[in-house]
Amino acid sequence: MVMNGFDTNFDGENEIYAVNTVAFAYHDRPIRVKRGELVRMYVVNILEFDFVNSFHLHANFFDYYDHGTTLEPTLRIVDTIMQCQAQRGILEFTFKDHEPGQYMFHAHQTEFVELGWMSVFEVV
């Protein structure tokens, strides 16, 4: 998953924030995951003009492998990570103890969320 933004008026600030280049991309069309199945997400922050981006998962926790270069998680049982520009990592989690339904994920900066960086997993 690519976390990025767009400076649409060339003023040196992002007016749109997104994952995989589309604002609110998975809000109307959630990412479907099977209950109990391991989800492994490769995330990279390629945001320009903002030094830090983040990922926050509602109602769940994940293990995080910073830079994706270790065999053991760098962080265990977290619900939010921060990434600097060009930083990458791997998230692993399941929804085995959750009811089917929708679970939000988004940046943990209010401005980013309001301008497009908010999406949903749909557990089936």
Segments and roles (model prediction):
Residues 1-124:
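Copper-binding active sites and cupredoxin-like electron-transfer domains
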